[in-house]
């Protein structure tokens, strides 16, 4: 799952366990193999579920990813808010290193 909310939303509210954070403004850069910002967890033939706070940003992200050639992409219609309201598990972003940037000289 890809969490496209802004970092402050993630820090304030948490996220879905195991989700990868990609701010909406970076999605096309991180998802394009031609981009110098490409992240290898974006694979065109891998099932990808995108979510935001309420479903608005994620539905647009899905359309963008489909236009880029992603074959199996969907969004969480009710967003993180719906996930939270349903009582599903939430991960505190401060408890996992994948939410923290490493200094450029760190290995």
Where are these regions (language model features)?
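Rhodanese-like catalytic fold shared by cysteine-dependent sulfurtransferases
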Residues: 4-48, 56-107
């Amino acid at each position: 799952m890809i969490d496209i909310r802004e970092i402050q939303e993630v820090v304030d509210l948490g996220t879905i366990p195991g989700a990868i954070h990609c701010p909406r403004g970076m999605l096309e850069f991180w998802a394009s193999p031609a981009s110098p910002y490409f992240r290898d967890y974006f694979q065109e033939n891998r099932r990808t579920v995108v979510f935001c706070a309420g479903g608005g940003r994620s539905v647009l992200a899905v359309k963008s990813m489909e236009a880029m050639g992603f074959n199996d992409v969907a969004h969480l219609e009710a967003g993180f808010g719906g996930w939270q309201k349903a009582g599903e598990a939430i991960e505190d972003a401060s408890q996992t290193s994948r939410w923290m940037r490493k200094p450029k000289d760190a290995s």
